[in-house]
Swiss-Prot record:
Keywords: ATP-binding, Cytoplasm, Cytoskeleton, Nucleotide-binding
Compartments, as annotated in UniProt: Cytoplasm, Cytoskeleton
Keyword Nucleotide-binding listed: yes
Anything else known: There are at least 16 actin genes in soybean.
Described purpose of this protein according to its UniProt entry: Actins are highly conserved proteins that are involved in various types of cell motility and are ubiquitously expressed in all eukaryotic cells.
Molecular function in Gene Ontology: ATP binding
Protein's recorded name: Actin-6
Family, as annotated: Belongs to the actin family.
Organism: Glycine max
Recorded coiled-coil stretches: none
Main localization of the protein described in the UniProt heading: cytoplasm
GO CC field: cytoplasm; cytoskeleton
Length: 17
């Protein structure tokens, strides 16, 4: 889910951040 991190790095809802 790298897309989510690139789109919303502040939220980091993907779990990788």
């Amino acid at each position: 889910m790298a897309d989510a991190e690139d789109i919303q790095p502040l939220v980091c809802d993907n779990g990788t951040g």
